[in-house]
Each structure stands twice: as C-alpha cells, then as structure tokens.
Amino acid sequence: MKVAIANRQRRHPIGTPRLRKVAERILSALGYPDSELSVVITGDLGIRRVNREYLHKDRPTNVISFAMAEGEFGALNPAMLGDVIISADTAAREAEEGGVSFWSRLCFLLLHGILHITGYDHERSGEAEARRMEAKEREIFAILEREGLV
C-alpha cells in the first residue's frame, strides 16, 4: 500500500505520518490493501482553483476526489485509486462549527474522499446510495476511533 501525502499549506499543523496511517487503515477496511493513493492538503485558495478548473465551481470546498478508474487511462494501473484534495482551512472552520477537533474533521474528510474514489456517491445516485455511503462512513470512522487514530 502506497499513500503519498503532500501538505501544501502551513496555517494548520498536520502530522503527515499520522495521516498516512489513517489513510492506510481506511483503505484496509475497504478491502484495498495493495492500492495507491495521493492526498493533498491545501488551503481554501488552492482547492478553489481546483474546484473552478475541474468542477466549474468558483468557490472553496472541503474535499475533492478524482478517481483514476474514471479517467481515460484508468485501466492502465488499477492499483492507483486516485487523488484526494482537502482544504485544511475549510476543515478547520467546519470543525469549529461542528464542535469537533480539527484532526477529527480532517480524518472524516479523508474518509469521505476515499469513499468517493472507491465508488460511493451521495450526490448523483439517489437517497439509497447516500444512505449506504453514510453508513459506511459511520462504520469506518468508528474503527478509526476504536483504534485511536482519530
């Protein structure tokens, strides 16, 4: 399992080895032990650029995922799942609004992004799929909490 993490912001301290462990545990729980994943932590400005360029939405968001399997050459390397981009700025705001720690929110957004990459969808596939994704989020987040990763 290979998880590459790039922290491209400095405002919010993030332990990348610790975040890598969380990503590896999520992938293991989902049955992807031999996969590869790229995670980028950025600020609102960086994620806004990505959101505008690729999704045509000119605003920051919390997490954006790009699944390699959805691309034109997805079958070339099936082990490469894709990229998860998280805004630490938005995560920090959401953590404060939700009364949870920044770390907890960051890990939840990582989980949410990985679920999208592995085929879960809450936006385009209807209520049943949204409930299935939310149930999987609760299940795996509980594992992370039990194991002291969150």
UniProtKB/Swiss-Prot annotation:
Zn(2+) binds at H112, H116, H122. It is an enzyme of class 3 (hydrolase). Gene3D superfamilies: Metalloproteases ('zincins'), catalytic domain. The gene is ybeY. Belongs to the endoribonuclease YbeY family. Single strand-specific metallo-endoribonuclease involved in late-stage 70S ribosome quality control and in maturation of the 3' terminus of the 16S rRNA. Coiled coil: none annotated. The keyword Glycoprotein does not apply. Its EC number is 3.1.-.-. GO terms for molecular function: metalloendopeptidase activity; RNA endonuclease activity; zinc ion binding. Pfam families: YbeY (PF02130). One of its GO terms (cellular component) is cytoplasm. Keywords: Cytoplasm, Endonuclease, Hydrolase, Metal-binding, Nuclease, Ribosome biogenesis, rRNA processing, Zinc. SUPFAM superfamilies: Metalloproteases ('zincins'), catalytic domain. Its cofactor is Zn(2+). This is Endoribonuclease YbeY.
